[in-house]
């Protein structure tokens, strides 16, 4: 791991201090995003943006809970970008272009109908890999995610490796396997 992402993880851990569930979640999403991005052969700039967005993707949860009494994904998309912008500005090692793309990804990571860019696709897949497990989703939900959400070869392989051995039939719902 590079120093920039290690420092971002430290800052986000401080931001989520006392909330191990959220810290565990973003760490797992980061690791899956980093893995998928590497296996998909992303260029260094896109990989950097992806990993930063994965670390920060749920930064809007606490403020959403305070403002709306809910951590619903749409509220996270509303509140997250500004919180992320503040944290990245304090760190002083993000360009304006990086900040804008990371904020865009955070502001759309629960919107699945118009995914634009490989970084966006991989962030969504990484978050799904973690959420499908953490939320103990049904076989139907996992199969549906495989069919409708996952597009990268690496993401599909990880999903199948994670869930097919448990009796879930993700592969039978993909036409392009």
Put a short name on every predicted segment:
Residues 2, 17-27, 31-43, 56, ...:
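Divalent metal-dependent phosphate-bond-processing catalytic cores, especially two-metal-ion Mg2+/Mn2+ enzymes
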Residues 29-32, 36, 74-91:
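An active-site-proximal "capping" alpha-helix that borders the catalytic cofactor pocket
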């Amino acid at each position: 791991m590079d120093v920039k992402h290690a420092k971002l993880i430290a800052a986000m851990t401080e931001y989520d201090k006392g909330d191990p569930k959220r810290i565990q979640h973003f760490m797992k999403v980061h690791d899956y995003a980093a893995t998928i991005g590497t296996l998909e052969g992303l260029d260094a700039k896109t990989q950097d943006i992806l990993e930063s967005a994965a670390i920060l993707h749920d930064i809007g949860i606490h403020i959403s809970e305070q403002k709306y009494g809910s951590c619903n994904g749409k509220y996270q998309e509303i509140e997250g970008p500004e919180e992320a912008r503040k944290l990245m500005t304090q760190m002083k090692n993000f360009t304006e272009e990086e900040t804008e793309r990371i904020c865009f990804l955070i502001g759309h990571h629960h919107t699945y109908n118009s995914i634009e860019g490989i970084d966006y696709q991989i962030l969504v897949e990484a978050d799904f890999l973690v959420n499908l497990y953490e939320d103990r989703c049904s076989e139907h939900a996992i199969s549906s995610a495989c069919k409708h959400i996952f597009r990268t070869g690496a993401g599909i392989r990880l999903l199948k490796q994670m869930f097919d051995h448990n009796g879930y039939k993700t592969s039978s719902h993909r036409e392009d396997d």
